[in-house]
Amino acid sequence: MDGLDALLAENVVFSSPVVFTPIPGKELTKMYLIAAGFTFNMEQFQYTREVHDGLHSVLEFETTIDDIAVNGVDMIEWTAEGKILDFKVMIRPRKAVEKVHEKMMSALEKQ
């Protein structure tokens, strides 16, 4: 995942919808983003709306996991150098959050 290494700031913080506290650091953030790649059915995953304002981006996405529709947003804060400093994911509806939690835990156990 060399692309992630180049994209993430060393002091990045990742906030997951399935973990209670924010996750600090590049290596842990990478681990969660890789697990998300296995979780989010990337064949159907698509960004449907983007809003950018200076060093902040909000990207709305949709996908389907095990026949459950998932709708969410990635909220990203960038450094002046173009690296991700803060990455927060929010998901709805509740059934989707539960499915993502189940799949993420499984993907993380395999890493």
Locate the predicted segments by residue:
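A solvent-exposed, acidic/Ser-Thr-rich amphipathic alpha-helical stretch
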Residues: 2-54
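A beta-strand edge to alpha-helix "cap/lid" segment located at domain peripheries
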Residues: 37-111
